[in-house]
């Protein structure tokens, strides 16, 4: 099993190895790990780090590729609530610093409203379609605790819940 550094560096070498010198590749790897707060664990192996740290290494590996669009499928789903919140906050900061667009799949309503500028809600089933799109007009940076009572946050959250528990059910019945 590879260390945190080697895990990210392997991907960096594959993508940039032909065009960049070794010192540049090393610097790119270290910068990606620093971006997700993992500089202190460069030489740690998977069995030596937590689940949240493993997620951050995966995010660092993806960000090191300098993607215009970062695709994330339930990236925080298996984490405890505090680790999830910390990584969500880190992701908000990373997006500000890198300017990357993130497309994330999540089943967590609060996560969707906190992290998104737009929420695309899908209908159920194998023939799922776009059910509704909610624009989230919250200012950035976003402060999780302050948002709990923010009327715009509450309104967006309510829109998502209404779709999931009322209109979504209606869409399903029409399709059947």
Which residue ranges define each predicted feature?
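Signature (C-motif/LSGGQ) region and adjacent switch/coupling loops
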Residues: 5, 42-45
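Short helical segment in ABC ATPase nucleotide-binding domains corresponding to the A-loop/adjacent helical element
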Residues: 5-13, 135
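A short, proline-enriched helix->beta-strand linker immediately N-terminal to the Walker B motif
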Residues: 64-68
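Conserved H-loop
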Residues: 99-105
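Hydrophobic anchor residue at the start of the ABC signature
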Residues: 59
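Catalytic Walker B motif of ABC-type/P-loop ATPase nucleotide-binding domains
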Residues: 70-73
């Amino acid at each position: 099993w590879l260390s945190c550094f080697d895990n990210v560096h392997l991907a960096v070498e594959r993508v940039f190895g032909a065009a960049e010198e070794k010192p540049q590749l090393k610097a790119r790897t270290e910068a990606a790990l620093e971006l997700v707060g993992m500089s202190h664990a460069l030489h740690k192996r998977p069995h030596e780090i937590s689940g949240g740290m493993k997620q951050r290494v995966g995010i660092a590996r993806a960000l090191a590729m300098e993607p215009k669009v970062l695709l994330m499928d339930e990236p925080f789903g298996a984490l405890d609530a505090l680790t999830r919140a910390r990584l969500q906050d880190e992701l908000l900061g990373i997006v500000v610093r890198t300017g990357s667009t993130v497309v994330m799949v999540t089943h967590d309503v609060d996560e969707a409203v906190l992290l998104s500028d737009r929420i695309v809600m899908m209908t159920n089933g194998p023939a799922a379609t776009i059910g509704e799109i909610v624009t989230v007009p919250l200012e950035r940076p976003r402060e999780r605790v302050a948002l709990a009572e923010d009327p715009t946050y509450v309104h967006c959250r309510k829109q998502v819940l209404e779709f999931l528990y009322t209109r979504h059910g209606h869409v399903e019945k029409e399709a059947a």
